[in-house]
Amino acid sequence: MKYVRYIAAESLRMYPEPPLLIRRALESDELPPGSGGPDGVRPKITRGVDLFLAIYNLHRSKDFWENPDTFDPDRFDRPFENKGVQDWAGFRPELLEGQMYPNEVASDFAYLPFGGGQRKCVGDQFALMESVVTLSMLIRRFDFELTVKPEEVGFYTGATIHTRNGLPMRVKKRVFPGKSETEGGEASKSEPVKAAGSAVAA
């Protein structure tokens, strides 16, 4: 199940929900070292200003991720550091000991699909566990085949990321030898579900 958990985590890295977070400064402050432009000036934040945090861009940044546009669930088992980013501690898998999923602590706030700190989503662990259990049950019982080219799916963003035209798939029920459809066993072949070929929107 560890690999399935990492698949869910990597999916949220590449397509975070939401792709943008908004925070309001309670007090005037300035951003930490390394956050300024080429001149090194640290931007000042005025009390009451709304800050838009581009999580999608953060998760796709080469500063914080190795090959960021590649789907690679195993990346969460590998340390990654970038001395060019001032005061960033890097991604440290050892900090995930006892944790089921990657988090902002192990990534020093480079991984924020649910936010981080005191304002982090309180349901993050439940949401991840629910998605992993659901995914595991589905892929055990069905085979899924995308009926369009991946580049044809398309995305658009609002409060969350959506597929532009749904996610058309051909779904086939997996058949287990010597077992009824409701019993377990090892899969031997696939048979089309009655609704095979219909579009399944994600």
Protein language model features and the residues they cover:
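Hydrophobic, well-ordered secondary-structure elements that form the walls
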Residues: S11, G48, F71, G117, ...
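C-terminal helix/juxtamembrane-tail motif
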Residues: H162-A202
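Conserved cytochrome P450 K-helix/beta-meander segment immediately N-terminal to the heme-binding cysteine loop
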Residues: Y15, L53-Y101
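Residue-level recognition of short, solvent-exposed, well-ordered loop/turn junctions
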Residues: K44-T46
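Conserved cytochrome P450 K-helix E-x-x-R motif and the immediately C-terminal K′/meander segment
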Residues: M1-D39, K62
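Cytochrome P450 heme-binding "Cys pocket" and the immediately downstream C-terminal segment
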Residues: A106-S107, G116-K120, D124-H162
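Conserved beta-strand elements of beta-rich interaction domains across eukaryotes
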Residues: P19, D50, N57-H59, R78, ...
